Amino acid sequence: GILCSSYRTFPLPAAQYIAEKYHLPLVIDLRDIVEQYASNEYIAHNFRTFSWLDRKITETFRHKLLRDRNNALRKADQVTTISPWHVEKLQAYNPNTELVYNGYDPELFYPEQHRTSQFVITYTGRLISLATRDPRLLFEAVSRLDREKLIDPDQFRIQWYVDAGSKAIIMQAATAYPVARYMDFFDYVPASEIPGVLNRSSILLQLANTFASDGPKGFMTTKLFESMAVGKPLLCVKSDESCLEATIRNTRSGLAARTAEEAFRFILHHYQFWQDNGYTHINTDKEAVERFSRKKQAEQFMRIFTRLNSK
C-alpha cells in the first residue's frame, strides 16, 4: 500500500496517482490541517504586498490547499489523523477516518529521577502566535509567587528552548509581568538531548489556548506525549478546555490550567515538594500513557494495511 503523511498537499496527487497506477490501497495521514490554526499561521510568512492583496493571495492559497487536499481525501482508502477534533473534521470528506495519535519513542523517553539545585519549568518548542499558544497565565501565576515571596530567582527558573521568533513573542507577552529575571533562553538542542532536558526539569510546560471557532483546534503535539512519558508534572497553559485537557486529566499527568489561580496552586505544590526532596514527581497512569507510544502507532498502521490488503 501507499502511505502519504503530509501537511502540505503537493505530495497527495502523486501518492494518489501511484496508488491508482499500481492498484494499491492509499492511506493519507494528516498530522496538521489548515483548519486547526487560529488564523493564517500555517503560512510561513506574509506575501509582503499591500494588506488587501495579502488577504486576497492568502484566501486563494487556502482555497487551493483545501480543494486539492479534499479531492485526495475523498479517493483515499483510509485517512488517519491526530485528535478527536481532526477525525470529526476530516470525516466530512472521508468517513474512513481513524485516530492515530502523535506519540513518543519509549526507548528514548522514560522516567529518570534527578535531584537538581534549581526548580526549573521547561518549554521546548515554537510559538507562532499568542492566539495559538499563550503563556500569560504562567506569567501571572509566577508574578504572584514572586509578589508573595514564595520563590526567588536563584532557585526558580523558567527555561525556554525556542527560536528567535518565539523568543520575541514570549518577551513581548512578558512585558506586563515582572518575570524577566526568572527566565533563561536557549537555542534548540539536538533531538538526542531532549530526553535529558525533560528529565532534569521540575515542571514541563505545554502552551495552548482555549478551543474556539476563531481559535486553535485539536492541537495534540508529539512534545505533549514525550512530556507525559518522562513522568514529570505537566502544566498546560492556557487549557484548550477540550481534547488536550481531557488527555492530561485521563493520564493523570498534570494540569491544564484554565485560570492563573489553578496554575499558581499547581506550581506552588510542586515547588514545595521540590524544596523538601530535590526533585518532582507525579503519579501518572502509566497504562494510559503507554497507549501513545510509537509502538502502538505502528501496530495501528499494521492493522490498517493488513485490512486493506486483504480486500
Predicted regions and their residues:
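A charged, aromatic-enriched C-terminal amphipathic alpha-helix characteristic of glycosyltransferases
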Residues: R258-E262, Q275, Y279-L308
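Acidic donor-binding loop of glycosyltransferase active sites
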Residues: D77, L198-K217
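Short N-terminal targeting/anchoring amphipathic segment
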Residues: G1-P11, H23-R31
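Membrane-proximal helix-turn-helix segments that form the acceptor-binding/catalytic region
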Residues: F10-P13, Y17-K21, V34-Q36, T49-V79
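Acidic anion/phosphate-binding donor-loop and adjacent secondary structure
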Residues: N40, Q91, Y104-Q118
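Nucleotide-activated donor-binding/catalytic signature segment of Leloir-type glycosyltransferases, i.e.
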Residues: P153-Q155, V162, K167-G196
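Conserved donor-binding/catalytic core segment of Leloir-type glycosyltransferases
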Residues: Q113-P135, F139-V142, Q297
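Carbohydrate-associated surface elements
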Residues: W85, G103
